[in-house]
């Protein structure tokens, strides 16, 4: 016993010493990577600090623009994360773009610039294109780069411009540019709106701003940093999911008070790493049986547990936040996510403001999600088991505000405003819809081949597979205390009975939506009968079909409180 007590005492002592020895490193645009990183002798690059920082250390970054891809070398611990933060009160920008200077003016009015390939930082703007499983290019190549002048990207052309060239020179309109590859260099021909030698444009030359090359770089905090302009590859759920910022199969990241924008594909990724058995940027029809079995043989409980809060995420080609399996047990709150996949230059199956696979026991709450593209606001795909979507405002999305694809639940929608033309698309079962204001249309249908698609179920509150192939036929939707234009009709799509209790149906003519501010006012017609709303608890919701699992804890919302 005395020996055990001594071991415990020494372990506590060592842990205390480790925290006490934690360092604070400083980075400044005027620093020097040969310095010691102290407050008086800061480093020049964030990467220099990221190579040195270990558990418990803090990296304080002074105001400026940092043109680098930061690759964290080490992991923190749950009780001693590695913190990367802007100096309080100062603006720090990490960008994947570089200024392009010394343009030549041609006699035809175009601007020309030849750039050697060996000047780029991990992304070749002339030859690297978006590609991958579940990606539809719409008949043309799409560059991972961007050419930006005065904050506005130009429309880029590659092979599609070859038929419009005279003597090797493209014909392009103002606001467009052509990227013509060579052997060791490439040439840009651009029709800028302003003189590029006065208003200097920037070209995206890096695939990320802060992304770990190695997995399990756990417990990292990013605080009050602006990340913009990078060219990650398409992030599909059976391969590596890279973003402007990405955890790469790690645990316990906190990304707070940050801005993320200008991604070719994803903004923030909390998802999968690359494996030799992945469908990595290849055809989508790889057998799920082998892939799924090998994926879930890993200890998936080691990843996830992330927090993304108070962030502004915008202008991402694919998704604002995405995460396949690595976003389990995570929290996304108080964020604004907008204009992701808004211009829709390509299509695919991974586009939304938030796109998660297997967000087990994850919470998405108090976010403002608007003006997003084809699949809309929030897309939960597979194993949304114990997922809570609470107190969000979704509006002006081109697709549905919320899309549930082949989940078995339980999933809780509570206290949300869903104000787009199309509010909800159900291809799942076991969903509790409590105390929401739902303006748009409902869609409920069976997945491909009349709902024959089967997906895994998990043991409650874990990432351990219970059954690999379980029916996803829709049903057991529980509507209580909602304000809606009408009672949804699901027809023959439903396999399991649904419940409608104490909902208030007010026709759309009496709703006023502000698509700029994301607000709603509802003025029911005279004589409209408001039901007596009653509090909702887990006992009232009951358990799920198929899984016999309780729904997540509900705050008991009623529509009259929204």
Which residues make up each language-model segment?
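Positively charged n-region of N-terminal signal peptides that target proteins for export
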Residues: 1-5
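Short amphipathic alpha-helical "recognition" segments used for binding
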Residues: 6-7, 519
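Bacterial N-terminal signal peptides
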Residues: 9-18
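Boundary at the C-terminal end of the N-terminal hydrophobic targeting segment
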Residues: 20-23
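Extracellular polysaccharide-degrading/modifying enzymes targeting complex plant/algal/animal polysaccharides
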Residues: 26-249, 259-262, 269-298, 527-562
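Glycine- and acidic/polar-rich repeat regions and solenoidal domains
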Residues: 210, 232-248, 264-544, 548-550
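Mature catalytic domains of secreted/periplasmic carbohydrate-active enzymes
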Residues: 253-254
């Amino acid at each position: 016993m005395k020996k055990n007590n001594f071991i415990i005492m020494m372990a506590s002592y060592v842990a205390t010493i480790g925290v006490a020895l934690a360092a604070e490193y400083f980075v400044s645009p005027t620093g020097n990577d040969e310095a010691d990183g102290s407050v008086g002798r800061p480093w020049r690059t964030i990467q220099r600090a990221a190579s040195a920082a270990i558990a418990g250390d803090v990296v304080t970054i002074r105001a400026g623009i940092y043109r680098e891809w930061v690759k964290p070398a080490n992991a923190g611990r749950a009780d001693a994360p590695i913190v990367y933060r802007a100096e309080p009160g100062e603006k720090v920008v990490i960008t994947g773009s570089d200024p392009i200077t010394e343009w030549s003016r041609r006699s035809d009015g175009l601007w020309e610039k030849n750039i050697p390939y060996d000047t780029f930082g991990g992304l070749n703007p002339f030859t690297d294109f978006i590609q991958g499983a579940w990606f539809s290019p719409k008949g043309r190549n799409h560059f991972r780069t961007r050419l930006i002048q005065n904050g506005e990207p130009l429309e880029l052309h590659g092979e599609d411009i070859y038929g419009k060239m005279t003597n090797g020179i493209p014909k392009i309109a103002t606001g467009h540019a052509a990227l013509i590859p060579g052997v060791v260099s490439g040439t840009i021909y651009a029709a800028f709106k302003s003189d590029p030698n006065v208003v200097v444009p920037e070209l995206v030359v890096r695939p990320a701003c802060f992304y770990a090359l190695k997995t399990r770089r756990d417990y990292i905090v990013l605080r009050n940093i602006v990340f913009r302009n990078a060219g990650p590859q398409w992030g599909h759920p059976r391969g590596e999911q890279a973003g402007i910022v990405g955890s790469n199969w790690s645990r316990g990241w906190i990304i707070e008070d940050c801005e993320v924008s200008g991604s070719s594909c994803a903004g923030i990724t909390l998802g999968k790493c690359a494996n030799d058995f992945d469908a990595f940027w290849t055809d989508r029809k790889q057998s799920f049986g082998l892939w799924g079995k090998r994926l879930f043989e890993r200890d998936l409980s080691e990843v996830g547990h992330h927090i993304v809060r108070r962030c502004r995420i915008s202008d991402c080609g694919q998704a604002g936040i995405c995460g396949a399996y690595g976003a389990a047990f995570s929290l996304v709150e108080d964020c604004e996510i907008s204009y992701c996949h808004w211009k829709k230059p390509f299509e695919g199956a991974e586009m939304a403001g938030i796109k998660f696979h297997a967000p087990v026991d994850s919470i998405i709450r108090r976010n403002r999600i608007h003006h997003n593209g084809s699949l809309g606001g929030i897309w939960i795909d597979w194993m949304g088991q114990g997922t809570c979507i609470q107190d969000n405002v979704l509006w002006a999305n081109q697709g549905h505000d919320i899309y549930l694809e082949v989940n078995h639940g339980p999933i809780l929608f509570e206290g949300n405003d869903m104000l787009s033309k199309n509010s909800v698309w159900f291809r799942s079962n076991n969903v509790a819809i409590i105390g929401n204001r739902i303006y748009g249309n409902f869609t409920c249908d069976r997945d491909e081949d009349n709902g024959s698609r089967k997906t895994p179920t998990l043991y409650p509150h874990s990432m351990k597979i219970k059954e690999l192939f379980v029916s996803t036929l829709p049903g057991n939707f529980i509507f209580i205390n909602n304000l809606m234009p009408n009672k949804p009709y699901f027809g023959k799509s439903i396999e399991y009975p649904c419940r409608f209790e104490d909902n208030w149906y007010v026709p759309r003519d009496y709703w006023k939506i502000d698509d700029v501010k994301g607000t709603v006012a509802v003025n029911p017609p005279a004589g409209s009968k408001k039901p007596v709303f009653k509090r909702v608890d887990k006992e009232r919701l009951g358990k799920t079909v198929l899984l016999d699992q309780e729904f997540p804890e509900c705050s008991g919302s009623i529509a009259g409180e929204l």
